[in-house]
Design a protein with these regions (language model features):
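A contiguous, low-structure linker/loop signature
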Residues: 101-121, 127
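Extreme N-terminal starter segment of soluble prokaryotic enzymes
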Residues: 27-28
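Glycine-rich, positively charged N-terminal anion/phosphate-binding segment
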Residues: 12-19, 34-109
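Ala/Thr-enriched low-complexity intrinsically disordered regions
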Residues: 2-4, 10
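Alpha-helix-loop-beta-strand connector modules within alpha/beta enzyme cores
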Residues: 75-83, 132-147
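Active-site-adjacent beta->alpha loops and helix N-cap segments on the catalytic face
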Residues: 64-71, 120-142
Length: 147
């Protein structure tokens, strides 16, 4: 596919609504989760300029850490336009399930499990893209979160 053909497709694709389960995102201009970037003010700003969706910074899936100031800041959804999305990261099925429920109780309508971050410090904890090395673990994580 050439750049010119991508440009021709872009307006149609980007402006088409996207449905994720029971949530509708007005367009496909999605701001990816970025550590140190996609905090609450940044997400609200992006949405005010037309982004259909903006995902929180990665939040570690250990609810024991959620009382920390940094964790509370990352999971702050005050004033955000729905649908609200939180990204969580971890490798323990029970902790991931608890973190998912915590984010939902905190206002998130969509919870994204980080399976793409290549950062060394994330992968060393068998999280992010390192999860893709273990299909059985991914299945256990998804089963715990969905069920």
């Amino acid at each position: 596919m050439t750049f010119a053909s991508i440009q021709r497709l872009t307006p149609h694709l980007l402006l088409t609504p996207l449905n994720i389960h029971n949530q509708t995102i007005d367009n496909r201009l999605i701001v990816a989760p970025m550590a140190g970037v996609t905090d609450n003010p940044s997400r609200r700003l992006c949405k005010s300029f037309g982004a259909g969706h903006a995902v929180s910074e990665m939040i570690i899936a250990d609810t024991a850490l959620y009382a920390r100031k940094k964790s509370l800041y990352r999971a702050n959804f005050d004033g955000e336009i729905a649908p609200i999305s939180a990204q969580i990261a971890g490798a323990d099925p029970d902790k991931l399930a608890d973190a998912t429920q915590f984010q939902i109780d905190n206002g998130a309508q969509i919870v994204d499990i980080n399976m793409g971050c290549p950062a060394k410090k994330v992968c060393q904890k068998m999280a992010g893209s390192a999860l893709l090395q273990d299909e059985n673990l991914v299945k256990r994580l998804l089963d715990a979160v969905v069920n």
